[in-house]
Amino acid sequence: EYCNSFLSFCPTVAVILNVEEDHLDFFRDLADIQHSFRRFAELVPPAGPVIVNADNAGAMEAVAGLEPPIFTFGLDHTADCTAANLTEVDGRPVFDVMIRGEKYARVELHVYGHHNVLNALAAASAAWALGLPGHAVETGLASFTGAGRRFEHKGTYHGAEVYDDYA
C-alpha cells in the first residue's frame, strides 16, 4: 500500500488485513490511509468480495457502506470466517476454519503468532470466496513456512535461538 502502489492493481478479490497509522512519511494520517484502502476496495468488480479483518477497526471503518459484498474474518468479533478449537502444537496454531458456522478446513500452521492465525483466516476466506475446497486450504497453509526475514529462525548461537525479523 506504500505510495498507493496497490491502486494500480485490478483485483477480482480484495483482502484487507489491517489499516493502521503506518507509512506516515507518505500518508497524512489514518483518515488518509483509510481513504486509500477504500479506493482499493472500490476497484473490485461488483461480484467480487472485499475480505476484511473484523478485528481491525481501521479496516472496518475504511469499507463501511461499501457496495461490493463485504466478507469478514476475525477472532475477537462475530465474523463470516472465524477460528474454532484454537490450540497450539509446539507453539504453532492449530484450529478449525469456520465459514458462517460451518467447518471449512482444519489448519495446522508452521508459523507462530496470533497475527498468522488472522493471516490464515484471510487466506481461507479468499479461497472460499473463489470456490476452492477446504482441503486445498489445509494443504496450502500447511506448506507455508513464512516469509523471509519475518521471524525467520537462523539457528542457535551459544545456546540462544537466533531469529531474523526486520520489521
Where are these predicted regions, by residue range?
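Switch II (G3) loop of P-loop NTPases
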Residues: 1-2, 162-167
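Acidic, Mg2+-coordinating active-site environments of NTP-dependent enzymes
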Residues: 7-162
